[in-house]
Amino acid sequence: MPEITAFPQPKSDLSILLLGAGGREHALAFKLAQSSRVARIVVCPGNGGTALMGGKVSNLALPWGAPPAFRSIVEWAQKENIDLVVPGPEQPLVDGVEGAFKKVGIPVFGPSPAAAMLEGSKSLSKEFMARHNIPTAAFRSFTSTQYEDAVAYIKSKPFTSGRSVIKASGLAAGKGVLIPETDEEAFAALKSVMVDKEFGDAGDEVVVEEYLSGPEISVLAFSDGYTIVPMPAAQDHKRIGEGDTGLNTGGMGAYAPAPIATKEIMERCVKDVLEPTIKGMREDGYPFVGMLFTGFMITADGPRVLEYNVRFGDPETQALMLLLDEQTDLAEVLLACVERRLDSIKLGYKQGYAVSVVLASEGYPGSYPKGLPMTLNPTPEGVEVFHAGTKRSDNVTVTDGGRVLAVCASAPTLRAAVDLAYSGISQISFQGQTFRRDIAYRALSSEPPAEPKGLTYAAAGVSVDAGNDLVEAIKPVVKATRRPGADSDIGGFGGAFDLAKAGYKDPILVSGTDGVGTKLRVALDHGKHNTVGIDLVAMSVNDLIVQGAEPLYFLDYYACSKLDVPVAADVITGIAEGCLQAGCALIGGETAEMPGMYHGDDYDLAGFAVGVVERAQILPTPDIASGDVLLALSSSGPHSNGFSLIRKIVSLSNLSLHDTAPWDKNTSVGDALLTPTKVYIKPLLPGIKSGLYKGMSHITGGGFTENIPRIFSSASNLGVKLDLTSYSLPAIWKWLMRAGNVEAKEMVRTFNCGVGMIIIVAKDKADAALSSLKENGEEAWVIGEVQEKKGVEYVGLDKFGL
């Protein structure tokens, strides 16, 4: 009986060529050797550690390192029937090793020479990110002939953070990034890179980018050009000394997974960066196949790309190889990438953590001795020693580089993995060995105490004591807001209000809720928290007063990841101040401490207000008619709307929140923008109770165009004519128009433009209304009239702001 046709079986005796001589290559050889499909691994040139592995692994002493020399290694690979090439370092990838092997039909786990420019040119990679809307630091690139232009750019104060980072665009052995503290240091850094050529040709182009702050993570991800699969995020330690002090190195240790890389953070890294990167490279015509190693800064606004690398990281790889479980075949994963079928592969990881600690030569990262003999005693179970700068000499392993070894361990907890790695180091010695004793200190410093008697709410990140401290801190200011009908103490299960004591005969309750929007981002970035509480109250109570309602009481909602009592007290003190201005009682609220829901020191606010109005005084009245007069009450500034656009304009103007405001030399940008929303209650209530007003509009997001028509019913044909020449546009709005190139039409449908409240009155009551407002501390003016035409008609729009 003839055999049924079947697909050929995958090759089960693979020969793999590993290019490189470091700890990364030793770790890759270690994991590849576990594959049942791999028969032989040749490491070229390898090191003392790969020389001692035996079994499937051997070294090859064949020179390569520049395109002409690829010929000899390619010819050798052809003769030896190599099935897969895995370059370790970035230089051969940028130099075109993938293309050299591709010509003879040998697949390479690594990007094409063009795709490798993601690492080979920082200027190119930044332009790529900008083109594909991938979040990264603001930047500008310069050629080496534009030194004076680069200096002038820094002098122009282009970044909100006030600091810059100088990067040599080309490959500089991991040393081409300079982080000056001051402008003077930045100028010196530019000179060293662009004029003095400290990094040689790597400095032919320079990137000047904004300094970002926050924790860093490294995400290594496999890609086949379509699918991208990240490994757990790692954190490395670049500085030579404990506490991240001293000179920068290639890396003194790493650990994974990094606790800071929460599920939410990783999802954003994938959705906002990794997937758009792979899609963008494919769209640009350079599909990325290989290892995409992305450095992220976790900022208050989310993950931002620091840099791309196009190969396995060192020393992250050493730790990550220990995390891969026994069922994960690394050779199969690499082949799936080059064969464009990564979506068919599943990577598995051990439960727990892995750590790598680098042992370096004395003097590293400067000059250091070589050829020193080493003592390598047996290490505890669970410890792996990956060689980097070593070689075999007369059957003795000696030092042969700056970073000599990476001692690695995995364990169920990070603390156990760290302790196990350091116990392994105790079995190793060579003259002048240098290593950091604080690897993973960032994560360990936030660990709960060892062997707790039992889990507590505080151990989960919620401090009941902090909540109690906050209640005690705010009790005096809350008590000051009491009014007839509201006498309960804060800290209970809610608030009660006795409506009978408020003195109303035929009351209608009116409620409103609101937040502060992205004005909160300004408060957080500026570090000023005592005014946004006023905004929170104002936004809700001003919505009550336009219905004729007097605010009775207010409740707030304050949410954060970790309660900072002084900050929360500032916010709630502001809320109490807003309540005092509105004449309402702060009778309760909720402070929600929710670890993992918010990032860092971020918090969010919401408010809820309840007011009352006599049935006969509900606004708007049904008798609004054409010819009625519109009165305008000034705003105190942007109030709490339009801040997404305002922040964008400020950013594009290269202003920081601490800079002097261009529209007011007596204050800073941040202080000016945080001027609290005006509370209109007390000036308006007397006129409401006297029956002077027919309707009102609180000018919030949507400006005049969207808010004023809300006074009229949908069945009405009424609208308004607004005379913009009746007042002078305040300086802040003129600056925003000019700096953002915002058209007048956009201004009046986005911002309040200096008018926070519009009142409709009968023409014969206009003078009485103006007098009532003035007597109660509010200057107003006639800004227009009601007409038989829907919408808002503007007079003077063409000259608005000039």
Curated annotation (Swiss-Prot):
* Pfam families reported in the protein's UniProt record: AIRS, AIRS_C, GARS_A, GARS_C, GARS_N
Which controlled-vocabulary keywords does the entry list? ATP-binding, Cytoplasm, Ligase, Magnesium, Manganese, Metal-binding, Multifunctional enzyme, Nucleotide-binding, Purine biosynthesis
Residue ranges spanning the membrane: these are none
* Record-listed ATP binding positions: 157-218
**Does the record's keyword annotation contain Heme?**
no
Please list the cofactors this protein needs. Mg(2+); Mn(2+)
Cellular localization per UniProt: Cytoplasm, Cytosol
Q: Look up the record and report any one GO term of the cellular component aspect.
A: cytosol
Look up the domain of life of the source: Eukaryota
Q: Where along the chain is Mg(2+) bound?
A: E307, N309
Give the ATP-grasp domain ranges: 126-339
Q: How is loss of this gene reflected in the phenotype of the organism?
A: Growth auxotrophic for adenine. Avirulent in a mouse inhalation infection model. Does not appear to affect production of the virulence factors melanin, protease, urease, or phospholipase B, or on capsule formation.
Instruction: Fetch the InterPro entries from UniProt.
Output: ATP-grasp, ATP_grasp_subdomain_1, PreATP-grasp_dom_sf, PRibGlycinamid_synth_ATP-grasp, PRibGlycinamide_synth, PRibGlycinamide_synth_C-dom, PRibGlycinamide_synth_C_sf, PRibGlycinamide_synth_CS
Give me the comment on cofactor binding: Binds two magnesium or manganese ions per subunit.
The family note in this entry says: In the N-terminal section; belongs to the GARS family. In the C-terminal section; belongs to the AIR synthase family.
Quote the HAMAP family the UniProt record gives.
AIRS (MF_00741), GARS (MF_00138)
Assembly information from the UniProt record = Homodimer.
What is this protein's name?
Bifunctional purine biosynthetic protein ADE5,7
**What species was this sequence derived from?**
Cryptococcus neoformans var. grubii serotype A (strain H99 / ATCC 208821 / CBS 10515 / FGSC 9487)
